[in-house]
């Protein structure tokens, strides 16, 4: 049921319409060769943490340049914490392949979602993925808006969220970029695909 709602919420309810939309706009405003930091100027993310950790750090945010500068990063975005495909397939694909990603020289694997850092923290702990993956909240969606990866999932009772996507970024430059046709899809954004692209 949730998958059907997500698919319906994606662009007039038609997967074909969603595919045509992606094709006509080149997937997103960024792609291979783009500088991810320049594409989202002034944007910072909030690292997943408990409320007490937030207080202790004055609710600090992390600028994108600090996340990507001088590093090889695999980053993936998803519609939301505690949702079906995200919990059952997307995050586990990266958690289960972390050693293979590190063996390819990846410095960090990052999950970003339009959520607050506290919900992400609880979710990451529930998935036992915090040791393998860094989780960041894009609480107001500004990062995903800047990349043209925002989607309205109000029909699935989620509001404005992120499309499901992944990228390999080397020192801020996008080397590989994958976006699913619908947020409920899980065909091109998993770790198995990005491993072949590094």
Swiss-Prot record:
Catalytic activity, EC: 1.11.1.25
GO BP annotations listed: cell redox homeostasis; cellular response to oxidative stress; hydrogen peroxide catabolic process
Entry keyword Oxidoreductase: yes
Keyword Iron-sulfur attributed: no
Lineage: superkingdom: Eukaryota
GO cellular component term of the entry, any: mitochondrial matrix
One of the record's GO molecular function terms: thioredoxin peroxidase activity
Catalytic activity line of the entry: [glutaredoxin]-dithiol + a hydroperoxide = [glutaredoxin]-disulfide + an alcohol + H2O
Compartment(s) of residence: Mitochondrion matrix
Thioredoxin domain segment(s): 34-198
Residues at the catalytic site: 86 (cysteine sulfenic acid (-soh) intermediate)
Predominant subcellular localization, coarse grouping: mitochondrion
SUPFAM superfamilies: Thioredoxin-like
Alphabetized Gene3D superfamilies for the sequence: Glutaredoxin
Enzyme class: oxidoreductase
Transmembrane segments: none
Keywords: Antioxidant, Mitochondrion, Oxidoreductase, Peroxidase, Redox-active center, Transit peptide
Transit peptide per record: 1-27
Misc remark: The active site is a conserved redox-active cysteine residue, the peroxidatic cysteine (C(P)), which makes the nucleophilic attack on the peroxide substrate. The peroxide oxidizes the C(P)-SH to cysteine sulfenic acid (C(P)-SOH), which then reacts with another cysteine residue, the resolving cysteine (C(R)), to form a disulfide bridge. The disulfide is subsequently reduced by an appropriate electron donor to complete the catalytic cycle. In this 1-Cys peroxiredoxin, no C(R) is present and C(P) instead forms a disulfide with a cysteine from another protein or with a small thiol molecule.
Binding partners and assembly: Monomer.
Function: Thiol-specific peroxidase that catalyzes the reduction of hydrogen peroxide and organic hydroperoxides to water and alcohols, respectively. Plays a role in cell protection against oxidative stress by detoxifying peroxides. Reduces preferentially hydrogen peroxide rather than alkyl peroxides. May be involved in mitochondrial redox homeostasis.
Family: Belongs to the peroxiredoxin family. Prx5 subfamily.
Name used for this protein in its record: Peroxiredoxin-2F, mitochondrial
Gene: PRXIIF
